[in-house]
Amino acid sequence: TLTYQVLEKHNHSGNMEHLQIKFDCMGVYDNTYVGILQTAYASGLKEFPMPCVFTNCHNCLCAVGGTINTDVHKYAESACVKSGGIFVPPHEAVIHQYMREMMINSGDMAIVSDSHTRYGTQGSVSIGEGGPELAKAMLGKYYEIDYPQVIAVYLTGAPKPWVGPMDVALSLIGAVFKNNFVKNKVLEFVGPGVKSLSMDFRNGIDTMTTESACLSSVWVTDENTREYFEVHGRPQGYQKMEPGSQALYDGIVEINLDTVVPMIALPFHPSNAYPLADVIADPEKYLGMVEEEAKRVFENNKDIHLDLKSKIINGKIKVDQA
């Protein structure tokens, strides 16, 4: 599998059942990097052992007047000067797109302090983790996990007009989250349907696989991938990535892109995914379901009352904001 190829290259344990991973690069952002840095410095950090990106895209400036937390950014900038990091100033980039465009090569592994860390469309197996694992990586320590199961996501067909990547992602999440079919496993996107998708479309699906409860995701690479690297000035980062002729998977999810329809996710999790047409046709049923679920979710907080049915006007859903 693609997953095996990438993990084997990064494993230092000598045992593919129990992995000790070293990453190619890492990324952190402004509402997590202070604690990560302080932990790493208190534990002996001198220089970052790999390229380490610091972005400022997660709204710590929004608290009061847009300036109250500028000291956070100064702290990170000084850490980059001190220890050799890459500081991306506020308002310049969102972390995941920066990593895709500037850092990730085919076959790489990255660790980033955000749950939606997914750079699989470039042939990378990347991990979103909490602060302690990022601090460990800053200190040159291994990321230790057992070898994960791998699920093939076999794509056929092509999306219809008005169907976007979120519709495909919600269809997948709705099918596999509640039954734990892909939990803590790696999703490997293969099949003839991949070539019908632009890189941005693939990225939109890829970043949402987190909500399926999988560990990571990776895609075969092709000419669209090669062009993506060329457009962003890094043609040398591209590598043809595909499974071997006898790749063995622990399971398979088949998605016929021809049949995917516009979807909507209702509270309180993206796996509550339904065809948008069904919700529009019977809003009483679906919004009533959400209200009943809210009673269970907020049973210990009697002050919270979810009123969605009042948004139904003449049989149609009134949207307050978007």
Tell where the protein language model's regions lie, with residue ranges:
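Fe-S-dependent hydro-lyases/dehydratases of central metabolism
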Residues: 1-322
